[in-house]
């Protein structure tokens, strides 16, 4: 594979596609700030006290415009940061340039090879003058696993890590269960203001955007198949239904399957759906959800894509045995021996970030406000507060704070409990309003 390594002076502590895109990136960063009230409120609240002073954060998360606002919030609160992307296709090159031009070390560009992907992550582990991280901010767990496998001695200085997504949290749980987690972790994904907003409402807007940008296909009237009906699957199914698709859902969990049926979706197996669908989206976080046999059964020019974190949900490697014809960046046709073609988006990686620009700024503000609060929580923790090394969640009052910071932007006004009402249901007038096990 021809290298996509950009030409950047070795003396500079960054590597991006084109630093000349920085002005464009800065303009979009400023626009995004207005749509990210949670992060901007944290800058206002904590900008003077600098609660992250002394924190050296290694970050591995999609290098988008929205992430640029997150990064600059972390630095505004006192942290130093080194950054890479957690996906080979998700970087927005003008966003990376904007951050690099601001003097923040970033190593990311769209279209990384696997070798370049890991090289970029490695650059966040060490920096000039002996810089090493004492905090980790991750999305998907690749940086976390690298640190545990290759640099376990560095983890002695790491106070904790925060993890953004479902897949990464599963990896953390497995490490903790095996007694191999070497630093405390906060599961940001399961904050209500992340999973019930980013995963659901974010996908509801960004999935169809990615498919349309990739294919220009008419969605209305198509039969769409969504594998998985968790929060991401729910948002994906709604996205496709809102575009006029007839949506089929596949599920392994009887509760999620019943939810899908009660929403009016037809619940089927992938074996049944393969020959019926015009468009397939995986959202399970699992492996081999769409197999080569499923793809052999699909219609000519069926569209196949994934909105889960990794590219393991579709058996892409099995398709490598056939001829690939690139149509444009992140859009390929795979030609079967009988002449049938399938349209594969982003090589089975995140379609909304590979073929489009991901979730809107507003919903990412909620997710990233959780990330900043998690970093503060871990960095400011009292000795032993987050021991043993385990996977924790943010306390309910912080989850509610994140939501409250976003209400004014959408014109929402809260009702306040009277003393009698608060006493009747046994809560404080200031919250938290629900117990930790409440299912929103």
From Swiss-Prot:
SUPFAM superfamilies: Formate/glycerate dehydrogenase catalytic domain-like, NAD(P)-binding Rossmann-fold domains. GO terms for biological process: L-homocysteine biosynthetic process; one-carbon metabolic process; S-adenosylmethionine cycle. Pathway: Amino-acid biosynthesis; L-homocysteine biosynthesis; L-homocysteine from S-adenosyl-L-homocysteine: step 1/1. NAD(+) binds at residues 165-167, 199, 228-233, 251, 286, 307-309, 352. It is an enzyme of class 3 (hydrolase). Binds 1 NAD(+) per subunit. One of its GO terms (cellular component) is cytosol. The keyword Glycoprotein does not apply. InterPro entries: Adenosylhomocyst_ase-like_sf, Adenosylhomocysteinase-like, Ado_hCys_hydrolase_NAD-bd, NAD(P)-bd_dom_sf, S-Ado-L-homoCys_hydrolase_CS. It is found in: Cytoplasm. Its EC number is 3.13.2.1. Pfam families: AdoHcyase, AdoHcyase_NAD. The keyword Aminoacyl-tRNA synthetase does not apply. Its cofactor is NAD(+). Substrate binds at residues 64, 139, 164, 194, 198. One of its GO terms (molecular function) is adenosylhomocysteinase activity. May play a key role in the regulation of the intracellular concentration of adenosylhomocysteine. Belongs to the adenosylhomocysteinase family. This is Adenosylhomocysteinase. It comes from Granulibacter bethesdensis (strain ATCC BAA-1260 / CGDNIH1). The gene is ahcY.
